[in-house]
Amino acid sequence: MLSSLAPYMANPRQTLTQVLNFALVLSTAFMLWKGLSVITNSTSPIVVVLSGSMEPAFQRGDLLFLWNRSPRVDVGEIVVYNVRGKDIPIVHRVMRSFPELPGREDKKNVKKGGEEGEETSSTPSQKLLTKGDNNMADDTELYAQGQEYLDRKEDIVGSVRGYVPTVGYVTILLSEHPWLRSVLLGFMGLMVVLQRE
């Protein structure tokens, strides 16, 4: 097996160039993702619909484009949120909005300089109740234990601004079958390294 790699090891400069080209492709993709995150103000500017809870609006496997620059979310808007303590994005529609009363302050326990204290924020945060279009009940059962609504600033990843149907099935297949991901990455890496210019 090692004898088949001998022609590639004979010219280490070409092999190094190919490895660096592969690293350049990966770093460019990473920079594009981070740039898109900054532009949209979202940690995940592109997500895939993982369930059928939003049918008929979105099907499982649809690729969604998010925007998180709006200070408020309107009732009827479709948002993506993360449940506290879990890293699974959920795509559902806002059913109700509970704005904070003017002049009321949010209080959080914050450690400052090693001491625990209370920090007040004069910027009110919008509270939201969501529901999947294809679900019978609202999402209070999906929220973290003791959570009755979503916090606009803490829980919302972004609002849906566009989508491409069924393209996300590749992501679903790769997450449901980890061996397929390894095979695909190995194949791509092998093709880059073995490619001759």
Swiss-Prot record:
GO function terms (MF aspect): serine-type endopeptidase activity
**Membrane topology type:** Single-pass type II membrane protein
| Region called Disordered, residue ranges | 102-134
Q: Which family does it belong to?
A: Belongs to the peptidase S26B family.
- Basic and acidic residues: compositionally biased ranges: 102-115
Q: Which residues lie on this side of the membrane: Cytoplasmic?
A: 1-14
Give the gene symbol. SEC11
Partners and quaternary state?
Component of the signal peptidase complex (SPC) composed of a catalytic subunit SEC11 and three accessory subunits SPC1, SPC2 and SPC3. The complex induces a local thinning of the ER membrane which is used to measure the length of the signal peptide (SP) h-region of protein substrates. This ensures the selectivity of the complex towards h-regions shorter than 18-20 amino acids. SPC associates with the translocon complex.
So which stretches are on the Lumenal side?
Answer: 34-197
What are the entry keywords? Answer: Endoplasmic reticulum, Glycoprotein, Hydrolase, Membrane, Protease, Signal-anchor, Transmembrane, Transmembrane helix
Please state the Enzyme Commission number of this protein: 3.4.21.89
The UniProt entry's GO biological process terms, in alphabetical order, are: protein targeting to ER; signal peptide processing
Region C-terminal short (CTS) helix: start and end of each range? 183-194
Q: Where is the active site?
A: 53 (charge relay system), 92 (charge relay system), 139 (charge relay system)
Description of its domains: The C-terminal short (CTS) helix is essential for catalytic activity. It may be accommodated as a transmembrane helix in the thinned membrane environment of the complex, similarly to the signal peptide in the complex substrates.
Q: Which reaction does it catalyse?
A: Cleavage of hydrophobic, N-terminal signal or leader sequences from secreted and periplasmic proteins
From the Swiss-Prot or TrEMBL record, state where the protein is found: Endoplasmic reticulum membrane
Q: What is its main location?
A: endoplasmic reticulum
Q: Which InterPro entries match?
A: LexA/Signal_pep-like_sf, Pept_S26A_signal_pept_1_Ser-AS, Peptidase_S26, Peptidase_S26B
- This chain is glycosylated at 41
Organism, per UniProt? Paracoccidioides brasiliensis (strain Pb18)
- Assigned GO CC terms: signal peptidase complex
Designated name of the protein: Signal peptidase complex catalytic subunit SEC11
Q: Which spans are transmembrane here?
A: 15-33
Q: What does this protein do?
A: Catalytic component of the signal peptidase complex (SPC) which catalyzes the cleavage of N-terminal signal sequences from nascent proteins as they are translocated into the lumen of the endoplasmic reticulum. Specifically cleaves N-terminal signal peptides that contain a hydrophobic alpha-helix (h-region) shorter than 18-20 amino acids.
